């Protein structure tokens, strides 16, 4: 990202020349306006380069994983230059869904049955045109887990698939029950504490391609689900490695942060309505278990979880559910290489709840902590339409594990 610093310096020089020209033609009428603008520009550039653009903090449980990442995933040690005009966490979080492009992806849908009679929708990108891995049986496979109400249509998922396509890999997106347009066959949705559906999907995908390198990447709640699975199963998983992005490590801390007035207004209430809309489509399936009218009156994610999610999955209290849903305590039991990217200004995942000390005790875990980036933001460049810092971390890490993962054995 040294190029961005050079671009900023070049932009500053061009701005100076432009403003000097405007003074000559009388646009400002005097040199006072020019001096003010130049002074502000220089001060802002200095502040940005000295206080905003920083290298991420890399926390690992051992020298081996740290050296591996420095050698094969150097992006985690490079300076991250957030978008110069939108670097604050909330701004990045709000902007990303609207400004990032959506690369076209043609999916092949598959519905698989579950033990309780339900069904799960998987969206496959087979990448049969791969020239790097022409044999489908050994083509690396990446399982992607979207966020809370996300599907295979999310821009961050599409970008991961686009980058995987460049590497010659195959992708499959795990859509949680009832969110991708498929019928809900049983009165059950999903939560990040219950890993049964994920276990079903992992077993199914691995059975189709047992000889292919198999990795997973989870975003936000998808990352929480993935970490909870890995913490429960340890090394007894067909996955060779995993990556998570913008995970909420402690559900209590996440909820408390999102219930602050500004965060509630910007994020919490909207996501609550999304959750309500998702379950209301299948209202007839839940009327015997929960008071749907009461659920639809929830004003926060915590209220929704108390009235719906915790009840659906048999928890006695919301505190019991949130304790079980938090991946932080299970991090010590993760048995495969996992890279976790978080921003310390993410209001969905407060920095004080990031399990730094726990990560230091597990040689399989690496935390990459940026100073800015928000929640699934990580925008960079002057006009951040294309890939983000998160995308670059994803691409370098999965490629490193596929091509050099044996070095960690």
Swiss-Prot record:
Residues in the active site? 220 (charge relay system), 346 (charge relay system), 375 (charge relay system)
Q: Which keywords appear in this protein's UniProt record, sorted alphabetically?
A: Hydrolase, Lipid metabolism, Membrane, Phospholipid metabolism, Serine esterase, Signal-anchor, Transmembrane, Transmembrane helix
- Keyword Nucleotide-binding appears in the UniProt entry: no
User: Is Kinase among this UniProt entry's keywords?
Assistant: no
Reactions accelerated catalytically: a 1,2-diacyl-sn-glycero-3-phosphocholine + H2O = a 1-acyl-sn-glycero-3-phosphocholine + a fatty acid + H(+); a 1,2-diacyl-sn-glycero-3-phosphocholine + H2O = a 2-acyl-sn-glycero-3-phosphocholine + a fatty acid + H(+); 1-tetradecanoyl-2-(9Z,12Z-octadecadienoyl)-sn-glycero-3-phosphocholine + H2O = 2-(9Z,12Z-octadecadienoyl)-sn-glycero-3-phosphocholine + tetradecanoate + H(+); 1-tetradecanoyl-2-(9Z,12Z-octadecadienoyl)-sn-glycero-3-phosphocholine + H2O = 1-tetradecanoyl-sn-glycero-3-phosphocholine + (9Z,12Z)-octadecadienoate + H(+)
The protein's location, in the record's own words, is: Membrane
Enzyme Commission no:
3.1.1.32, 3.1.1.4
Show the GO MF annotations. acetylesterase activity; monoacylglycerol lipase activity; phospholipase A1 activity; phospholipase A2 activity
Functionally, this protein is described as follows:
Phospholipase that may play a role in phospholipids remodeling. May selectively cleave myristate (C14)-containing phosphatidylcholines through its predominant phospholipase 1 activity, cleaving preferentially acyl groups in sn1 position. In parallel, may have a minor phospholipase 2 activity acting on acyl groups in position sn2. In addition to (C14)-containing phosphatidylcholines, may also act on other medium-chain-containing and oxidatively truncated phospholipids.
For this entry, the protein name equals Phospholipase ABHD3
| Organism per entry | Homo sapiens (Human)
As recorded in Swiss-Prot or TrEMBL, the protein's gene is named ABHD3
